[in-house]
Amino acid sequence: MRTKQLRATIADIDFVLNAEGCSFADAPLKGFATEAGSAAGDDRVDVTVRLAENSPAPEIRDVRFSAKKDAFEDNCRTEWYLCSPTSADWEEEIIQYCGEEQNIKWASLRYSRNRAELTICHIKDTQGVVSPFTFPLLNIYLSRMMQLRGGFMIHSSVVEDKDGKGLLFTAVSGTGKSTIAHIFEGEGATIVNDDMVVVRPGADGGARAYAIPMRAYAQRPRSVALGGLFFISQSPKNWIERKKGATVVARVMSNSISQPFDAANALRLIGNISGCCLGIPAFTLGFKPDAEVVGVIRNALKGA
């Protein structure tokens, strides 16, 4: 289905997305859809997405941060520039240049706490269809916007265990985040998300993890109060060790979604992680991929 407007609730924030010169493929957001006019004020974010065919790229000026990296699974070079905004209405602007191997020549995003404008210049036939939040700059905006509200995004799997506690497992890709989530599912837990979540301060002073729309597959808008953090690695045997303080903040930060990166946002992210995570039992965990690890984790949390 194609549409000119999408409304979705993500991590308790209502997004209103409007398309100009394009249309949206709504499948990635279908499970997060909300009714029109469901929120206002600080709980609402308005996003405009424009398709700019063969338009010149924005001028790069007053660069705060820049980076070059391989872009996702396409193995293409991408350049990122974090610039000062052209107007006091915006917090900052991010400009992305892509290689010709990709579908996009350049893209720009400018944003504030409650508003964003994304412009995309395509160089191949796209039939004018954009999939919101499968596009890298909108994911970066989602990360930035959550940081402005005391939260952060992190590569992780999260399950809600049988006792209602949310368990977050984080590590680099390929370490076993999805594996351990599915092991817990086999022992009675419910998977909230098995790749990436938003963490925000909870109403009770703790923290809550939220599923978000993903690039490759559908998600449901689930959330859970966090009761344990686990920095995982694969091991010939199961072992677990309690961690506290700065070690926890550093480990969470290393797997958070925060690019493009600069000093001001780094300090804000450190504060958000500290506020959300330092009251939650945290552990390094070596595990072998069988059900025995579930008992190891549950026993560790009983003594935490």
Residues of each region from the PLM?
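A noncatalytic interaction/capping subdomain that flanks phosphate/NTP-handling catalytic cores
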Residues: 1-173, 186-190, 197-304
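Conserved glycine(s) of the Walker
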Residues: 175-177
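Post-Walker A alpha-helix
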Residues: 180-181
